[in-house]
Amino acid sequence: MSERVLIDGYNRRVDYLRMSVTDRCDFRCVYCMAEDMQFLPRQRVLTLEEIYQLAQSFVALGTRKIRLTGGEPLIRPGVVGLCKQIAALPGLRELCLTTNGSQLGKLASPLFDAGVKRLNVSLDSLDAERFKQMTRTGDLAQVIDGIDAARAAGFTRTKLNCVVMQGRNDHEINDLVQFAIERDLDISFIEEMPLGIISEHSRAESFFSSTQVRERIAERYTLIDSAESTHGPSRYWRLAEAPHIRLGFISPHSHNFCGTCNRVRLTVEGRLLLCLGNEHSVDLKAVLRAHPGQPERLEKAIIEAMKLKPYRHNFEVNDDVQVVRFMNMTGG
């Protein structure tokens, strides 16, 4: 039998799924959500079994990489068991997870044993007070302990994700690179994404491009362009002074990666988002609940949904919000 694959209307193969397991988070990062964020009632959220069933259908259709996200995925009860189920799906090559690191101290080893291959950990500052300001509730020491616990558990190629904001943490770029070098971690610098209406700061004023980040790094290190890929949006560079780590740049504004987009997102409400920067979506939860025990109905809906995937997003570097859902509702 020939391999089943998902192809969108622009002949791009879609084999990477980002699945949100919760919209809830123990942080309130200023670029991600409002401080008084109202979370979804439980009846609107997919059950763990439904998340697993959706993962089964996507893998049956050729998905090779799944990343679990949130909110903060590790605060959802039962998430380690879910990881073990998904990691065991025949045909899935890689199960990854993005976390703020707050729960890794106790969950890194169970996640590794469950079959999670790689972790991305958000870290925007190495200054405890600034970290608290940017996350509103976060404890820097707890996150660093979690990163060290992940290394001790056996995780390799753990990656730090840093959202760079002008006047907030841009002066810490090289300190974060040095932190990554010392702990043998990859690191990606991310341009702030205009999702959700915020009042805490002006996105136009806080924008700091990937080019500016590279220029800042080049003041201390020698950058070497790399053709490496992790099947995601990061474009990688190496450092002559520390060739064992990778530096990634995720640049939705300045160098968008739409032309080679291979991914879709599933919200914890069961909506399949065809693009991070558009509202095109399909309600897979409705299909799943209307046709229990009929995976073929779900797979048909997924295949049809690929026709709705746009060629590119519509992000702009200003304060005009094209997408009103916050990042935690999208699946970060």
Swiss-Prot record:
- Where in this chain does the record put each Radical SAM core domain? 9-220
Q: Which UniProt keywords apply?
A: 4Fe-4S, GTP-binding, Iron, Iron-sulfur, Lyase, Metal-binding, Molybdenum cofactor biosynthesis, Nucleotide-binding, S-adenosyl-L-methionine
Pathway(s) the chain acts in: Cofactor biosynthesis; molybdopterin biosynthesis
User: Which cofactor(s) are needed, names only?
Assistant: [4Fe-4S] cluster
- Transmembrane regions listed in the UniProt entry: none
Biological process terms from the Gene Ontology for this record are: Mo-molybdopterin cofactor biosynthetic process
- Describe how the cofactor binds: Binds 2 [4Fe-4S] clusters. Binds 1 [4Fe-4S] cluster coordinated with 3 cysteines and an exchangeable S-adenosyl-L-methionine and 1 [4Fe-4S] cluster coordinated with 3 cysteines and the GTP-derived substrate.
Q: Name one GO molecular function term.
A: GTP 3',8'-cyclase activity
Q: Which reaction does it catalyse?
A: GTP + AH2 + S-adenosyl-L-methionine = (8S)-3',8-cyclo-7,8-dihydroguanosine 5'-triphosphate + 5'-deoxyadenosine + L-methionine + A + H(+)
PROSITE patterns linked: MOAA_NIFB_PQQE, RADICAL_SAM
Per UniProt, the enzyme's principal EC class comes to lyase
Q: Which residues bind GTP?
A: R18, R67, T98, K159, R263, V264, R265
Residues binding S-adenosyl-L-methionine, per UniProt: Y31, G71, S122, M193
Q: Which CDD domains match?
A: Radical_SAM, Twitch_MoaA
According to its UniProt entry, what is the function of this protein?
A: Catalyzes the cyclization of GTP to (8S)-3',8-cyclo-7,8-dihydroguanosine 5'-triphosphate.
Summarize the subunit comment. Monomer and homodimer.
Q: What is this protein called?
A: GTP 3',8-cyclase
* The organism of origin for this protein: Pseudomonas fluorescens (strain Pf0-1)
The protein's gene is named moaA
